[in-house]
Amino acid sequence: MSAISGIFNLNGEAVSPVLLRRMTDTIAHRGPDGEGFYTDSFIGLGHRRLAIIDLSPAAHQPMATKSNQFVITYNGALYNFLQLRAELAALGHEFSSQSDAEVALYAYKQWGEKCLDRLNGHFAFAIWDKTRQTLFLARDRYGVKPFYYTLVGPHFIFASEQKAILTHPEVKREIDLEGLLEYFTFQNIFTDRTLLKGIRLFPPGSYAFLPLSPISHQLRTTRYWDFNFQEPATPAPRQEYIEELDRLFRQAVNRQLVSNVELGIYLSGGMDSGSITAIAARRLPYIKTFTCGFDLHSASGLELGFDEREKAEYMSYLF
């Protein structure tokens, strides 16, 4: 759980390093292992780091290519970054770290926005193209990583949390009544609205190019992925579905076990976290699991039925 932040003044006004730092400091809890800043006149990028892959200073962000044309601030985890790194190295790219953020950076340099079709994982990042003076923004397919933004006049401001955006003096603290209505109706917000007027959630499975422009102050997003539930013309035998689900599930779990720090699993008594634990424990014996519970001394019979601690404890002993 790292954090990103940034300011892009589309009218060419210089970004205040003090303001950028203040924004990034508000989300320091997301990245206790380091901070970094990049400013170049009208563009500023901030980062708070939670080190998981490559714990060395070489993986410090914001990170630039050797030519300094591209600069990235990235929050995420790429599960296929080792394969992509090998592919990019074969194409002539040289890496300065072992991080997945640098792989995302050079993947964009090599393939542009088409790199998103190759990234397997969850992420939210911004890449500044110094030559074209254009900011590239992208978010993972399911919107796992948070990415908020606002456009106030010529000021484009983004961050991993809304409170960082509120630090900017041009952003007003106003309730979005439509967002509030949506939340009270559905107990969730399914559009790009938030509870704060003017602050939007960058859509999942999407990207955007934002060029320096003193005239046009609009962000147009493009969808690069969406769900496809199309049924096959001829259904396969049931056993084939079982075997394919088993293969894909094991692949998904094993891909996420790459880390330079100790891994753990939130374990409930359900079959989802239990199944993940069973697969992960085959590669990482005695993996640590964590289960949360509440004092149920005065709980009703119905409430006691939701307590899964006993089942979770049993599963933790198994693995």
Map each language-model feature to its residues.
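Cysteine-centered catalytic environments shared across enzyme families
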Residues: M1-F319
